[in-house]
Amino acid sequence: MGLTSTSTGAGAADTALVLRRERPDDRIVALAGNPNVGKSTVFNALTGLRQHTGNWPGKTVTSAQGRCERGGRGYVLVDLPGTYSLMAHSAEEEVARDFLCFGGADGAVVVCDATCLERNLNLVLQTLELQPRTVVCVNLLDEAERKGVRVELEGLSRRLGVPVVGAAAGRGEGLEALMAAVEGVISAPEPPTPVPVRYPPPVEFAVASLRPLLEPRLRGRLPARWTALRLLEGDGAFLDRLSAALEWDPRADAALWGAVEEARADLERQGLGGGAWCERVVSALVETAEAIGAASVTQLRSAAGRREHNARKAAQRVQGPWIYRNGRGGAFCGYPDLERSLRV
């Protein structure tokens, strides 16, 4: 969802990033993805030499935006920093999250690596919670084919609840279909309905208690479910950004903030105080990403391919938890029925 270009204006003042439109009706599209998934290749293939680079204001993080046209419509693509998460534990994650929230994007594309899809889906799920007008681009299909990996694109789309387009951007394949899907989700009267991540019952109860209060206050500018989680986190810097962007400080809203404090107290009573409930949220994201990936990828054909795939999986299980423990600490919790429910 996020604040759109209509609600923020051409300058996207909330991020202080000047968006370089050539026409007032140019679409603003955020391009997100993990590092090394070919995101820059997609960006370069679509925009060619029509690019502008610099730094995000106040950050030592490189910014890039470029323009392309398809079917008479102009698009400004904003290449977000490569990140594994939107939980804002680094400058890159903060930039990506804040642009998706406040940067005026009409929609988003999340680029994934077809050869290690499961690892990429964590960011996809987080992006969908924030911006449902999203298209998932499964890139590097040519490399996946060489390694004997097949991604079931239609099944992946069903499990995520948003359009999924396959691409081999290095060969220019799939880009027309990608932009057609982008236009489709942006121009649709209603956004897609992504399949929500199921959090532990105490967290879902806390979120549900806040949504009726948030929806009339947000008025569609940000998703109430996603915002409820952020209020429960209580990140002061993000709340300052939220207050400036919406001209409304939730901390000064007695009824709402009282409900936030009560929801936190209830989580504490159930043994999920402090950062414990955040760890469970991260666990649910990781488990859901793994289950969707496992249900959407056909295993490799050759013994050599299987060895490489298993090595990638082992590395992922080492690196993935390290990334999240680095920010939150704690162990992951499993949901044994999740994979079965996602094999639809």
At which residue positions do the language-model features occur?
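Conserved G1/Walker A P-loop phosphate-binding module
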Residues: 2-90, 102-103, 107
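Residue-level signature of catalytic and energy-coupling elements of molecular machines
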Residues: 30, 42-43, 61, 77-79, ...
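N-terminal alpha-helical transmembrane segments of multi-pass membrane transport
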Residues: 36, 43, 50-53, 128-135, ...
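Conserved nucleotide-binding/hydrolysis micro-motifs of P-loop NTPases
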Residues: 49, 58, 82-83, 114-118, ...
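Helical mechanochemical/support elements of P-loop NTPase systems and associated helical scaffolds
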Residues: 57-64, 76, 88, 92-95, ...
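Conserved C-terminal guanine-recognition region of P-loop GTPase G domains, centered on the G4
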Residues: 66-72, 95-165
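Canonical P-loop GTPase G-domain recognition
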Residues: 142-198
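Extended helical scaffolds that flank P-loop GTPase cores
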Residues: 161, 191-344
